[in-house]
């Protein structure tokens, strides 16, 4: 007799994760771990120190509230899974570092959580790796962060070409529509964020934006920069050129895109994102000089966040090969359990990874089979007898 469909559906829902979340199995987890470690090493090499904001934040009434996953805690307080690490860092800095002057260099590798419509199929958990330079101002700070942005992607193995990184300027973009009412300007910018330049300009025209201003905005947004504020365009180009000085002679990268408008609303100056033809947007960042002031004393700041899963997809689209692991020795116990334990300890002390018995999920890791002879020697599958130190040299070669 078959299992009723309703019972099958209930059973399936019990073993599947909630909508928008997924299980990461060992092979992928290892690959993601390699990417995370590479990024963390790049952050540290530029003086950034890791920190860990809490998983929960106070639910807010900001424009991104609709994307927060909220619930009431046992105290009756409305809290949310953190939707954005930059905002969490801004709150932390305003509170914990309010009396500290000077520049802070902070980094993180952690997930954020954002609500997605049920029918969209979007992920509600996003693993991010990023940095925040708090207190750094001016062209040099912008260039350093933009250069680190590119360096992080390249250090993971991504081929960064001219079109991979796009650079814009929020001050220029909002200035193009400064004559509009704030609510209308928000509608126009919303259309631009969706990539609908024609729709944004049409809404500006309907709102009475003068024809000359419309022509100027059209030229700026469609790549004809000769009729826009030269100082703003020069700021974008100067930042890109200065960032490229980190690797003199390297291939050119960085395309000015005056229509670039990130999803998050707090950016105030230079903005940038990395786009891959197969994975879409894999990283973004920019200057946000007003965000920390929403929690306390204002401080200039700039940073970026990399979507680690999207970067992973982009790397595999380019036939990325993660570095090989050292093999795992599967040690078959002898009748003497004490000798087995001592042998395993000697092998580990020599630098060999050892598991007693078998391992069902190996995540692509190479294995060596061996039988225990005594507390320091094993017999390999080919019949050779090896002592722990000698085997360690062989495995490590």
Which residues does each predicted region cover?
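TRNA-binding/sensing appendages of the translation machinery
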Residues: 2-87, 143
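Positively charged, Gly/Ser-enriched RNA/tRNA-binding surfaces
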Residues: 28, 34-45, 57-58, 88-98, ...
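Acidic carboxylate-rich catalytic motifs and surrounding loops in phosphoryl-/glycosyl-chemistry enzymes
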Residues: 53-55, 164-169, 358
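Short, conserved secondary-structure transition motifs
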Residues: 167-180
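Acidic, His- and aromatic-enriched active-site or binding-groove loops in soluble protein domains
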Residues: 69-76, 180-203, 278
């Amino acid at each position: 007799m078959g299992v009723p469909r309703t019972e099958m559906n209930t059973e399936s829902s019990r073993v599947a994760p909630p909508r928008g979340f997924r299980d990461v199995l060992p092979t992928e987890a290892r690959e993601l771990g390699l990417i995370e470690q590479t990024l963390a090493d790049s952050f540290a090499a530029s003086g950034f120190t890791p920190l860990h904001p809490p998983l929960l934040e106070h639910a807010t009434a900001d424009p991104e509230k609709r994307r927060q996953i909220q619930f009431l805690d046992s105290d009756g307080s409305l809290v949310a899974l953190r939707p954005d690490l930059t905002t969490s860092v801004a709150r932390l800095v305003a509170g914990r570092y309010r009396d500290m002057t000077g520049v802070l260099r902070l980094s993180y590798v952690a997930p954020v959580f954002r609500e997605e419509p049920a029918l969209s199929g979007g992920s509600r958990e996003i693993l991010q790796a990023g940095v925040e330079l708090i207190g750094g101002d001016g062209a040099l700070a912008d260039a350093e962060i933009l250069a680190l942005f590119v360096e992080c992607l390249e250090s993971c193995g991504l081929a960064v070409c001219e079109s991979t990184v796009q650079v814009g300027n929020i001050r220029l973009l909002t200035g193009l529509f400064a004559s509009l009412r704030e609510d209308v300007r928000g509608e126009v910018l919303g259309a631009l964020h969706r990539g609908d330049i024609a729709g944004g300009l049409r809404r500006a025209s309907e709102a009475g934006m003068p024809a000359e201003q419309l022509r100027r905005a059209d030229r700026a947004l469609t790549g004809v920069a000769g009729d826009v504020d030269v100082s703003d365009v020069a700021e974008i180009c100067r930042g890109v050129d200065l960032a490229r000085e980190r690797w003199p002679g390297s291939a050119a990268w960085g395309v000015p895109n005056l229509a670039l408008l990130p999803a998050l609303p707090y950016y105030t100056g230079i903005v940038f994102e990395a786009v891959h033809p197969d994975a879409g947007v894999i990283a973004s960042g920019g200057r946000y000089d007003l965000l920390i002031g929403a929690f306390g004393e204002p401080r200039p700041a700039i940073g970026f966040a990399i979507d680690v899963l999207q970067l992973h997809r982009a790397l595999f689209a380019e036939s990325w090969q993660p570095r090989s692991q050292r093999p795992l020795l599967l040690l078959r116990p002898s009748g003497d359990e004490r000798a087995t334990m001592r042998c395993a300890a000697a092998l580990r002390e020599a630098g060999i990874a050892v598991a007693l018995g078998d391992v069902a999920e190996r995540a692509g890791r190479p294995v060596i089979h061996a039988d225990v002879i005594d507390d320091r020697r094993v017999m390999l599958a080919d019949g050779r007898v090896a002592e722990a130190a000698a085997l360690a040299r062989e495995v490590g070669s």
